[in-house]
């Protein structure tokens, strides 16, 4: 009996010592720090008091999108654990919250996991000015404090417009970053983004990126971009997991219709495409738009016009239903058929007939204008000739002196 008591005592001592060591290992990580240059590099480091006890150390990174990555940590003689990561190769979602923790393996083959830490991956390439309200947290680079007040006014007007297009309660406050130009926005987005992008919504972090004009007094670009990107945030709050599978023509059509100043080129592009019979079939606009600038512009123009047609004919509730209903892997055309009871091809034809019928009539008139002009001239000549003959006859009969 005494023998077993001794054995149990030694075993419990060993287990308690092991657990204590592991807890101690996690607790003795100190000076945990991160330092990064946006889009370039990230350094994560911590200090451990007993480096000789460490066999291996691993850094875990996880973004709020759920992506998990692991990186080895160097272990220096003074206990510094460090990992340097190239953000050109290991991209982090812009403005995401990044969580990280350390897995430590000891020379006795036990292991320990540290508590979780986090940092916000914001764009630190610029010196940002800010203006906060209960509605918006706005950041910009160029312009005085009064510029921030103007941005607040534009943003509030834009949100009102967006919620009229899509009546959804927004998640407040919304964060807005106003970049000096469109190229700055393109630089931080995925390399697959086309070079015509001037703004972007990041709905998972309730944030939008927009670009200012060279002339800071000209706010029209922002008055167009801000409500457009706000609409994408509203779409996301309505669709959630369905956002990425929603038809591109629907998402962009709603957002384009929310713009304070409609793009004056869109009407011209639609008429030109209709005249040349080069309209893009709507089923080809279910996914991402073409990177070609001209085709993309036509895609936006068609989407806006098509969504306007659907809303006017079937009502706004059908549009919301289309956003809220999971596609369940259905093709875009079949998905639309389930909601509207009409397939996408038939809706496309009906939209073209309703939208371009008047244009076709005008085009026919334009095509035959020489004949019409000649006919009008002949009628005018005939009228004058008749009047002349009547007057001559009256004069010959002595009725006119």
PLM features per residue range, with description:
Residues 2-20, 373-387:
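Sec-dependent N-terminal signal peptides of Gram-positive bacterial secreted proteins and lipoproteins
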Residues 10, 15-128:
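Glycan-association/targeting regions that enable binding to alpha-glucans and other polysaccharides
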Residues 55, 98, 134, 172, ...:
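Residues that flank catalytic or metal-binding motifs in active/ligand-binding sites
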Residues 58, 173-175, 348-350:
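Residues at or immediately flanking beta-strands
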Residues 119-130, 357-368:
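Short domain-boundary/entry signatures in modular proteins, especially
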Residues 127-243, 247, 331-335:
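Juxtacatalytic substrate-recognition/specificity segment
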Residues 195, 199-209, 220-225, 230-233, ...:
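Acidic/His/Gly-enriched intrinsically disordered linker/tail segments
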Residues 360-401:
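C-terminal single-pass membrane-anchor helix
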